[in-house]
Curated annotation (Swiss-Prot):
Keyword Phosphoprotein: yes
Similarity comment: Belongs to the varicellovirus ORF32 protein family.
The entry's keywords: Phosphoprotein
Region (Disordered): 1-32
Protein name, entry field: Phosphoprotein 32
Bias kind Polar residues: ranges: 1-14
Post-translational modification: Phosphorylated by ORF47 protein.
């Protein structure tokens, strides 16, 4: 009985899974079928190019080892979800504080700052270093 289970595990599957090839060909077909329309928004002097078609894209060209946001979780930009929440935030100013967008070919790295209204989707993107006040700043406030 055990040997039949081992043989079943050693048998190659009839369906080969090549995620990188599948993703690359899928993205290529998507771009061929409907190239994204690009438009420019201005967020406090920051030119930003975003695809209008709402298609999720792999967006960080820096990669997991270098990008702090990607080290937590790669970010996919989808215009009808998180970005729209920030775009319509009643405070208005939070859009520039919540996202630091790097322009390029499908490049967008989210940054979440302490004074940004927190939502559940933001949790993986909170980057604590550099944005948190140092202990010396807190001591000077109490004097």
């Amino acid at each position: 009985m055990e040997s039949s289970n081992i043989n079943a595990l050693q048998q190659p599957s009839s369906i080969a899974h090549h995620p990188s090839k599948q993703c690359a060909s899928s993205l290529n077909e998507t771009v061929k079928d409907s190239p994204p329309a690009i438009y420019e928004d201005r967020l406090e002097h920051t030119p930003v190019q975003l695809p209008r078609d709402g298609t999720p894209r792999d967006v960080c060209s820096v990669g997991q080892l270098t990008c702090r946001a990607c080290a937590t979780k790669p970010f996919r930009l989808n215009r009808d979800s998180q970005y729209d929440y920030l775009n319509t935030c009643p405070g208005g100013r939070h859009i520039s504080l919540a996202l630091e967008i790097i322009t390029g070919r499908w490049v967008c790295i989210p940054r979440v700052f302490p004074d940004t209204p927190e939502e559940k989707w933001m949790a993986p993107y909170i980057i604590p270093d550099r944005e948190q006040p140092s202990s010396g700043d807190e001591d000077s406030d109490t004097d």
